[in-house]
């Protein structure tokens, strides 16, 4: 999410600070880029299983379909909100399935279909061809025969709407597309990193109060990806006393669950529901104000920026839904 940069440094699980180039990935540096545009970030492509099929095999069988949809959204969010160019495999937003086929180049339309009407995702059409899949048939067969693992049209529509919101988030602010290694190294951090990091949770901050002013409407964004099956509470001491609120994209968006996200101003504490990605924004303060452009808010919410109204000055400072003023 920080551009896969070789020189980007962060605190690792053992408490040491390392650069991307110092992280080993199967004998190769995990961070290898000098600039974010050198990397294309994705979670599925034409090779191997689709995202939906991969989650089918990896999530516990008893995982509800609604949670599977949320995990699909979380997976796509790791690329949509990354500093690199983002790539989505065709149909990833529609829960597309190839019935667990890991190499479908010669499997025909039966396994490669893509239904843009959002009625059927293609799961359960039969065992995938043996050439590249037979070793997995022992796992594939019971999964493909399980009706609970096939999404209904309503699930596909929900996944599509959530994916649309991710695209709106990405283009709601240039802070998700800084475009240079220097800006990423200046502005992007992961406050929950290190040995005390919460399993299944990523917290990313993009601080627009340092370096060049990129978004004249914001002082920064805080992204929380909570892949766990419980709500997570994260405190960012550097944001204590600061006013953050849920992005207008999500406040007006398709997902009712994310709207339960809360922010406690006094301590800089955010609580995000289970299996949810939340993006909180901080409006630009007078200290960093340079003829702030509020068009980003209007284009994403359809309303005038709320800090232009008197209600902003009289807003409460207690724990409230993060979609409200705090």
Model-identified regions with their sequence ranges:
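Tryptophan (W) side chains
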Residues: 296-297, 307, 312
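Loop/helix patches that line or flank the sugar-binding groove of alpha-linked glycan CAZymes
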Residues: 19-222, 227-233, 238-242
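C-terminal beta-strand-rich structural cap/linker in extracellular carbohydrate-active enzymes
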Residues: 261-293
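Extended, Lys/Arg-enriched charged tracts that mediate electrostatic binding to polyanionic substrates
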Residues: 1-26
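Solvent-exposed beta-hairpin/edge-strand motifs
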Residues: 239-253
